[in-house]
Amino acid sequence: MDKECHIYVFLLTFLKLYVLVMDMRDIFQSVKAASRKLAIVADATRNAVLETLADKIEAKGDVLLDANSRDLARMDRKSALYDRLQLNKGRLMDIARSIREVASLPSPLGRILMERTLANGLVLRKVSVPFGVIGVVYEARPNVTFDVFSLCLKSGNACVLKGGSDAEESNKAAMSLIHEALKENGVDATVAEMLPSTHEATSMMLNAVGFVDVCIPRGGRKLIDFVRETAQVPVIETGAGVVSTYFDSKGDVEKGRRIVENAKTRRVSVCNALDCLIVDSNRLADVPSLCSPLAGHNVRIYADDKAFAILENNYPTELLCHATVDSYGTEFMDYAMALKIVDGVDEAIEHIAEYGSCHSESIVTEDKDTARYFQQRVDAACVYWNAPTSFTDGGQFGLGAEIGISTQKLGPRGPMGLEEMTTYKWLVDGNGQVRP
């Protein structure tokens, strides 16, 4: 009887997996077919879809908030992900405004990137075109559903989305509004699809060669590592940010205080938030002043021995801890950071090279030569001088919304706006020429 039971369970599991595989294949085929139609949809029509979607978010905000409340009810309020998951009326208005901003941007398609006439009379044009189908894997951030769709649609790309299970209800409600907006403007609704929030669905997307043209993971280091190690489709790495700010021997304390506070506390759950403050040993006496604004935000500091000694009587005891090796490579995504004392800019650069993630780094100094030295030698997508890393954002860079912050070197790097979501093809015009 036990053997028969095991066989039954095995067959049932196999059947469920088979059904999932067939369903996913149907989705990928439909989206791929729809992507070819979307590539030739007029920009005015794409903009109309986005305007309709923004209107729906404002008009049906209660539907989104109700779905979001069901997701929030399953999550611990103390979790660092709670803030990322939470929607409210203000955030919905921001989402609608961001979608309208995307609609107002120039189309990134059909731009002539280069044009030349060869000696044989052939006319070459390098023209921007969509990727085709973009797959995006992300965690508990329902706003990403709207961000990704609006950018994909505006850039002529279809999209397959795989959100985290924590935001399942919110994502379903968001995709329902997206499909309504597409249908009302005569655009095939299958240009955007939400996959089930299962590990199997993620694996299928990452291996959908021939259907998904590029995959973009948005989340923490574990998610990005999993996608990079598992995917057979091309991947653009985004998201994970172990971010440092170096306070140089010639740094201005007041600037440093403001920059450190803003970079660390403006929004702790985003990838551009400060994770490690590095201070020149010649400015050790200024560490309490640099850190004092953080106490009001209950920021826990993991300090090395030198920093701990000077903060011991100048920072709340319950918020001060001894750093370990692991402290420096941690993306905290919380009210916490590491603190390291170094002997000069070169040691700061070495520390960043060892523990950073090539995302965003900053130097606070009044010495221009030191600033340029730091900017040239630090390997990161964005390197700041006397400004907080919180500015690493597509909107702040004037790119409109972004699909993520790319930390790789091949392909897009830094905030990925509309232009970074296109590729190109060569158009070659001739008049009967043949190659000798």
Stretches with model-predicted labels:
Residues 8-17:
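Hydrophobic alpha-helical signal peptides and transmembrane signal-/tail-anchor segments
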Residues 18-124:
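N-terminal Rossmann-like NAD(P)+-binding subdomain of aldehyde/semialdehyde dehydrogenases
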Residues 23, 140, 147-158, 184, ...:
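ALDH superfamily catalytic-core signature
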Residues 34-40, 277-279, 334-343, 358-363:
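Short, well-ordered beta-strand elements within core beta-sheets of diverse protein domains
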Residues 48, 289, 345, 349-435:
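C-terminal core of ALDH-fold dehydrogenases
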Residues 104, 113-254:
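Rossmann-like NAD(P) dinucleotide-binding subdomain of oxidoreductase/dehydrogenase enzymes
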